[in-house]
Amino acid sequence: MAKIKDEWGEFLVRLARRAIEEYLKTGKEIEPPKDTPKELWEKMGVFVTLNRHNVPPQTALRGCIGFPLPIYPLVKATIKAAIYSAVDDPRFPPVKLEEMDNIIVEVSVLTPPELIEGPPEERPKKIKVGRDGLIVEKGIYSGLLLPQVPIEWGWDEEEFLAETCWKAGLPPDCWLDEDTKVYRFTAEIFEEEYPRGPVRRKSLV
């Protein structure tokens, strides 16, 4: 994955906000702008996170949906993920337009997931909190947590694995099972400093 320049990150965050606000006004999905940098037409995974402003991280989340795999061009995936995070996250009621004045938009661009090989009990040694996000898969169940989540909650590597299992609807110790697949990925994260404010690259460590 090409490194995402800061100006591209700002472009994606502004695009995500515009996609949400336009959809909440008209019910229509916006088209990618004509001035989209050509690099953002590359297929990449992306998540859009909506956080309430001036609220502790553990209770700030208002929506988060995305595409773990590079199935859409990044610019299109960002538009879709932004809209879905606002109106289709099953954990929350749909966002109302007036709420957007108090919501911080965050975009995480993902590297393709990499399967963690080797004995299950060694998995905690092969991930790093502050760098990696995780995907857990077992049978029909799967769950994903972004790299910023364990930082916000103060988890270590084993807790991060357990919570990703829980997110998948599985027992928290399922990461120790041979037939559970665990993938790691990294993300470049960009967020508004405050609603509609300057966009910054989010450092986790």
Curated annotation (Swiss-Prot):
Coiled coil: none
Residue spans crossing the bilayer: none
Annotated InterPro entries: AMMECR1, AMMECR1_dom_sf, AMMECR1_domain, AMMECR1_N, AmmeMemoSam_A, Uncharacterised_MJ0810
Pfam family, one: AMMECR1
Superkingdom of origin organism: Archaea
Every AMMECR1 domain range: 7-201
Classification via HAMAP family: AMMECR1
PANTHER family to which the protein is assigned, alphabetical: AMME SYNDROME CANDIDATE GENE 1 PROTEIN, AMMECR1 HOMOLOG
Protein name: Protein PYRAB00100
Species of provenance: Pyrococcus abyssi (strain GE5 / Orsay)
